[in-house]
Swiss-Prot record:
The lineage of its organism: Bacteria, Pseudomonadati, Pseudomonadota, Gammaproteobacteria, Alteromonadales. The keyword 4Fe-4S does not apply. It catalyses: prephenate + S-adenosyl-L-methionine = carboxy-S-adenosyl-L-methionine + 3-phenylpyruvate + H2O. It comes from Shewanella sediminis (strain HAW-EB3). This is Carboxy-S-adenosyl-L-methionine synthase. HAMAP family: Cx_SAM_synthase (MF_01589).
Length: 243
């Protein structure tokens, strides 16, 4: 995958525009997310383990917000000989184009349908696994219930949703502590104070994290009876919900 270094916010801007997954971001996304999201590599690798255990024959797998295809690739490596199909969706044409290039570098008998579109418009059908990897936090909060409803209805019994998100915490002391630890993580990965500040400003209006309690209540409302966090580092977590 592309390993160009993320320097998007390294120079000072007079006006910071809202963050978007454009060509500039797509070109450095692999570097950006691994230097910004603690545990990202572990989450991606473990998606393959989830797929190995839960993906069933003749079913669909959905990667909603697929970006460069890291989750799709991890899943695909573990599900040969199951006659499945992966539907990978992203609303960024730049991401889809680079995802297509990344997927073509690896041979697999499992087909991948790449869709450039809004994940809210995708009907989930005959799914044994659905992945939302740091995607739902960019949706308007009012749209999150309907998205999960669509996913739940389209999952086979015993199918899973893996939901990875940045978190907020109701306890202000915990919130402050984990935010500070995350900022130290970014500094340790080479981001300057200017880059951190400008990136934070660009995300302010487009990324709206929930608390774990909000996630749990939303999943329970849609019908998921089994739900828990399987990975957390600072204010980033990945959850699994079983239908």
């Amino acid at each position: 995958m592309n390993t160009s270094q993320d320097t998007i916010y390294a120079q000072a801007y007079e006006n910071i525009s809202d963050f978007q997954f454009d060509e500039k971001v797509a070109g450095v996304f692999n570097d950006m997310i691994r230097r910004s999201v603690p545990g990202y590599g572990q989450i991606i690798n473990t998606l393959g383990d989830f797929a190995n255990q839960y993906v069933t024959t003749d079913s669909n797998i959905y990667d909603l917000g697929c970006s460069l295809g890291a989750a799709t690739l991890s899943i695909r490596r573990h599900i040969d000989n199951r006659n499945c199909k992966i539907i990978a969706v992203d609303n960024s044409e730049s991401m889809i184009q680079r995802c297509r290039e990344n997927l073509s570098a690896y041979v697999s008998e499992t087909p991948v349908d790449l869709v450039c579109g809004d994940i809210r418009d995708i009907k989930i059908e005959n799914a044994s696994m659905v992945v939302l990897n740091f995607t739902m936090q960019f949706l308007a909060p009012k749209d999150r219930d309907s998205l999960l409803s669509n996913i739940y209805k389209g999952l086979r019994p015993g199918g899973i949703l893996v939901l990875s998100e940045k978190l907020n915490f109701e306890d202000e002391s915990i919130q402050s502590l984990l935010v500070d630890l995350h900022l130290d993580f970014k500094r340790a990965n080479g981001y300057s104070e200017l880059e951190i500040s400008q990136k934070r400003s660009s995300l302010e209006h487009v990324m709206k994290p929930d608390t774990l309690e909000q996630h749990g209540a939303r999943l329970k409302k849609q019908g998921f009876k089994h739900f828990n966090v399987w990975f957390q580092c600072f204010n980033f977590a990945s959850m699994v919900a079983i239908k």
